[in-house]
Amino acid sequence: MKIGVLALQGAFREHLNMLGTLGAEAVEVRKAEELPELSGLIIPGGESTTITKLLDIFGMAEPIKALAKKGMPIWGTCAGMICLAKELPGDISGVKPLGLMDITVRRNAFGRQVNSFEAMLKVKGLDKADFPAVFIRAPLVEKTGKGVEILSKLPDGTIVAVRENNLLAISFHPELSGDNRFHRYFVQMAKTYKA
């Protein structure tokens, strides 16, 4: 089983390191031809405009969509959540999301870099201990479709983690938390996929 981390831009090394703590085979992915050999793909945080443009430039958007439809697990964190969304309200400044998840996501919902924060979250599917979530220029989920499961919310009710079948999206950066439980959760999703 091999888990790929999209390595075109963003926090891919941190995801690779976190997967390494679990003994998972993790690889950097930069070409469309590397995708079919994967059991799962992580789209990391970074700059959503840049990531979606590079997905088009490198011919990866359509193969990722096809693999998602076949059931390959895909996990988007922060900017990766934006990439997976069907709808982005407001000024999307050239972002072309993959449109895979039935969610409406607002970019930079918590403000600029200086407004970054950490929060302890209860997360459905993880053990009872709260998860230390790091929010940096994070998006939020404004609306979910019928098939979308809400995994976590902030105390004010803001949705920050969702799952729709083989697709997982979270607003924050679990790779920066020092806690590998979300990565373990995704590895378990990847184990169920038959390429």
From Swiss-Prot:
GO terms for molecular function: glutaminase activity; pyridoxal 5'-phosphate synthase (glutamine hydrolysing) activity. It catalyses: aldehydo-D-ribose 5-phosphate + D-glyceraldehyde 3-phosphate + L-glutamine = pyridoxal 5'-phosphate + L-glutamate + phosphate + 3 H2O + H(+); L-glutamine + H2O = L-glutamate + NH4(+). L-glutamine binds at residues 46-48, 107, 136-137. Keywords: Glutamine amidotransferase, Hydrolase, Lyase, Pyridoxal phosphate. GO terms for cellular component: cytosol; glutaminase complex. Pfam families: SNO (PF01174). It comes from the Bacteria. Its EC number is 4.3.3.6, 3.5.1.2. Belongs to the glutaminase PdxT/SNO family. In the presence of PdxS, forms a dodecamer of heterodimers. Only shows activity in the heterodimer. This is Pyridoxal 5'-phosphate synthase subunit PdxT. It comes from Dehalococcoides mccartyi (strain ATCC BAA-2100 / JCM 16839 / KCTC 5957 / BAV1).
